[in-house]
C-alpha cells in the first residue's frame, strides 16, 4: 500500500492561510486538517476567526469544534488525531491539507513527542490548592529550585505551564528540561510537503491583525466571551481556552480590570506577539516552499502548483 501524503500550509495569524487553503480546495479534492489549538473549542467562533459555515460546507474541515472550553486538548492528542485523519482522508481518495499556525503541534507531529507523563488530576488539584494558599509566585520560586532551566524559559505569571512543569517533576523526579533534552528519533508514517506563507511586509501583517480584531468586535466578540462566562461558570482567566489570544484580554475587560480602549490595544498587541512567535518558529522549521501572501499573487500560485505536483496531479 502506498505511503500516504500530506501537504502542510503554515503561517502567522492573519497571514492569509485560510484564503489560500480555499484556493487549493478549488483545484484539488482536499480535506483540511486544522493545525490550530484555538479552533478545537466549541462556542469560540468569533475570537478564533473560525472558518465560516459556508467555507466548511465547501471543503471538509477536521479538528474544529471537537471539545468544550472546559476540556483540554494536547499536542499528543493532535498527533494521534492528525495521523489518523491523514490515513482516513487518503483512503477516501482525497488529499490531506494541514493548515494552521500552532507550531508546537506541528513540531510534535514532525519531530515526535517527548516521554512526558499524562496529567494527574490529584496532583494538579494539590498544586492549585498551593497556588490559592500561597500564590503563583510561590509555585514559580519552587520551579526555580527544582528546574531552573524551565523556570528561566517561562514567564512568572504563566500559571498553566508552571503547574505543568512542577507536575512533571513531581511525577517523574526529573525536571521537564531533562525530559525535553532526551527526545528520541522520529519517523513520519506519511510523506509530508511543508509550505509556509511568510510576509515580507510586517507592517501590512500588523495592519491586518488590527483590522481583523476590530472586525471581531463588530461581529460580537465581547458578547461571545460573555456567553462563555455564563455557559461555562468553571472557566477562569487561567483556563487553557481563555488563554487563547484575545480571550484573556476580553476576560480582563469584563472583570473590570481594564477599560475598553486598553482592552483593544492589549488584544491587538497580544495578537501581534503571537504572529511574531509563529514567524520565529517558522524560521527554525525546514520548509519545502515559501510564499509571500502580500505579493502580486504569483507567489501563492506557486504554492498551489507545488501542491498539485506533490500529489501527482
From Swiss-Prot:
Keyword presence, Cytoplasm: no
Molecular function in Gene Ontology: ATP binding; tRNA dimethylallyltransferase activity
Q: Which domain of life is it from?
A: Bacteria
Q: Which cofactor does it need?
A: Mg(2+)
Interaction with substrate tRNA: where is this region?
36-39, 160-164, 243-248
Q: Which residues bind substrate?
A: 13-18
Per the UniProt entry, the Enzyme Commission number(s) are 2.5.1.75
Site Interaction with substrate tRNA: list residues: 102, 124
The UniProt keywords, alphabetically, are: ATP-binding, Magnesium, Nucleotide-binding, Transferase, tRNA processing
Per UniProt, ATP binds at 11-18
Q: Name one GO biological process term.
A: tRNA modification
Q: Give the catalytic activity.
A: adenosine(37) in tRNA + dimethylallyl diphosphate = N(6)-dimethylallyladenosine(37) in tRNA + diphosphate
Q: Does the keyword Secreted apply?
A: no
The record ties this protein, via HAMAP family, to: IPP_trans
Assigned protein family: Belongs to the IPP transferase family.
Assembly behavior: Monomer.
Q: What does this protein do?
A: Catalyzes the transfer of a dimethylallyl group onto the adenine at position 37 in tRNAs that read codons beginning with uridine, leading to the formation of N6-(dimethylallyl)adenosine (i(6)A).
This chain's protein is named tRNA dimethylallyltransferase
**Gene name tied to this protein:** miaA
